[in-house]
């Protein structure tokens, strides 16, 4: 193969086409006997092989995205290894394109198979971006919100560009209220509230009962240590559970924009104003990286990783 004459012009053209280094382009052309298309595939395979190594690294940065299309909304999270990549326009465009498809896809498994504008599947496009961006990227999760009538409010906190940021929230209000603008404004306000207050459920009945019992046990043991009589302990525990509900149950939280009222009271007032029943059908709140274990490294390991490339 070394006898094949590879022109500088061919190497330059391949470099411009692929963005690969000069020596890599020359090697690709030699390995493929000067076949330009095969040389591109050769470099792509090299890039994908490099991407496979990067895929083992922990990705806990990145972006969340919220997308609403009529009565359907979706939230996704795409992770990268560093916040620097989250500010990369190529990565932002990738997340936006995936969010647009997610509204139609409905499930994450289906979404991964959907074709993007490039003709590649979402999964393939992510792998290609791992190779070109140089970091592990993962489509971590998605959730969909659908209502038959009403309004969906969206809010993205710490936006880097519209609809992409660190926290993404959707709130679906089921209602046949005629004034859609006011209903949408209320849904938007509740979405902002959810971003800031991080409720765990819509109402107390839908709250994880194991969590409630765990809190009840903690309150009971704490009250017992204080040496209170059993009948007093029971009242104290119930009081503390009510306070717990007011902190984690959306309808019982004090509303961000009117702290003297609960979210339930704000909705009740809106029902009177709009002349229709309003129900929170569902909310979704994604905070970037929540639940991901961050890799612990000591200083020596970090220096070694940098020096070894």
UniProtKB/Swiss-Prot annotation:
Quick check: keyword Glycoprotein in the entry?
no
* Domain of life of the native organism: Bacteria
Q: Name one GO molecular function term.
A: translation elongation factor activity
Q: Which residues form a coiled coil?
A: none
Write out the entry's keywords from A to Z: Cytoplasm, Elongation factor, Protein biosynthesis
According to its UniProt entry, this protein's organism is Rickettsia sibirica (strain ATCC VR-151 / 246)
Q: Which InterPro entries match?
A: EF-Ts_dimer_sf, Transl_elong_EFTs/EF1B, Transl_elong_EFTs/EF1B_dimer, Transl_elong_Ts_CS, UBA-like_sf
NCBIfam families in alphabetical order? tsf
Region (Involved in Mg(2+) ion dislocation from EF-Tu) spans which residues? 82-85
Q: Does the keyword Lipoprotein apply?
A: no
Identify the Gene3D superfamilies for this entry.
1.10.286.20, DNA helicase RuvA subunit, C-terminal domain (1.10.8.10), Elongation factor Ts, dimerisation domain (3.30.479.20)
What is the protein name given in its UniProt record? Elongation factor Ts
Compartment(s) where it occurs, according to its Swiss-Prot or TrEMBL record? Cytoplasm
Say which family it is in.
Belongs to the EF-Ts family.
Task: Please give the GO cellular component terms listed in this UniProt entry.
Answer: cytoplasm
Summary of the function given for this chain in its UniProt record? Associates with the EF-Tu.GDP complex and induces the exchange of GDP to GTP. It remains bound to the aminoacyl-tRNA.EF-Tu.GTP complex up to the GTP hydrolysis stage on the ribosome.
């Amino acid at each position: 193969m070394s006898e094949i004459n590879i022109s500088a012009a061919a190497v330059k053209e391949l470099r411009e086409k692929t963005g690969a280094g000069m020596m890599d382009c020359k090697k690709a052309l030699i390995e493929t006997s000067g076949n330009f298309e095969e040389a591109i595939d050769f470099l792509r395979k090299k890039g994908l092989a490099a991407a496979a190594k990067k895929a083992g690294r922990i990705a806990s940065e990145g972006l969340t995205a919220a997308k609403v299309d009529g009565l359907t909304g979706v939230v996704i999270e795409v992770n990268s290894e560093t916040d620097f990549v989250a500010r990369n326009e190529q990565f932002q465009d990738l997340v936006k394109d995936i969010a647009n498809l997610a509204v139609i896809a409905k499930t994450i498994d289906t979404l991964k198979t959907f074709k993007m504008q490039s003709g590649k599947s979402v999964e393939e496009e992510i792998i290609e971006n791992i190779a070109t961006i140089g970091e592990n990227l993962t489509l971590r999760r998605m959730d969909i919100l659908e209502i038959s009538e009403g309004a969906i409010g969206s809010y993205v906190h710490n936006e880097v560009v519209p609809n992409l940021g660190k926290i993404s929230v959707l709130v679906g209000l089921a209602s046949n209220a005629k004034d859609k603008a006011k209903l949408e404004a209320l849904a938007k306000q509740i979405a902002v509230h959810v971003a800031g207050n991080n409720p765990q459920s819509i109402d107390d009945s839908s709250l994880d009962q194991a969590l409630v019992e765990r809190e009840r046990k903690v309150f009971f043991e704490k009250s017992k240590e204080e040496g209170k009589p059993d009948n007093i302990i029971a009242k104290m525990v119930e009081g503390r559970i009510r306070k717990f509900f007011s902190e984690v149950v959306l309808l019982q939280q004090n509303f961000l924009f009117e702290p003297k009222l609960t979210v339930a009271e704000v909705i009740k007032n809106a029902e009177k104003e709009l002349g229709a029943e309003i129900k929170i059908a569902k909310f979704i709140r994604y905070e970037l990286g929540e639940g991901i274990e961050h890799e612990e490294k000591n200083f020596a390991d970090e220096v070694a990783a940098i020096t070894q490339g």
